[in-house]
Amino acid sequence: MKTIAIIFDPAHGKDVKGKCSPDGRHKEYLWSRDRINNLVPRLKSLGYDVYVTTDSDNEPGLSYRKKFATQLKTENRKLLISLHNNAAGSGLSWMSAQGVEVYTTPGVTDADVCSDIILRQFKKDFPEFKMRFYKDSYLERDKEASFTVLMGSGYMGVLIEWLFQDNKDDVIFLADLKINRKFENSLVESIEQINEHFKS
């Protein structure tokens, strides 16, 4: 019996400018939706109720995403996972920043527990990637921001910034099918651990 319902939130729509690599090869909207399209059936097969804030390739608006998660009716505790790629610049030039970040809202909440589980699993599965922790200690590994999609009520929200789409090396990783499958596996394992945590 699963105790949490998963709400996936895909990255910015394809009609939002600048959400790609400087050479245009990598598209954040597509990477995010491809991951979610693979994750949804896997998690459903494990017994989870899984939802997606939008099935459009275009941008529905940040408030729409938040409203979807807030108003979703389910008997289970809700966990929203927003999947993004990071960027250090405006998207016009290659930059040097690399690695992985996870964001929650300001303050310590149950979302911090979720983000800590996710980040520890990422660190285990991807020792070659830089984990950009706020501080490498329990419930402080995530970074905090008042991102609209995280600010709704009645759900735990985490926003994953998976690698930098304006770093040449990270873009190679983002295009690697094996790494993408490994990312999906790592996130599924994290969700299983989160589910177990909130059973008690």
Language model: regions and residue ranges:
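Loop/turn elements at helix/coil->beta-strand transitions in domains of secreted/extracellular proteins
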Residues: 2-4, 43-50, 74-80, 128-129, ...
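Short, well-structured alpha-helical segments in soluble
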Residues: 65-75
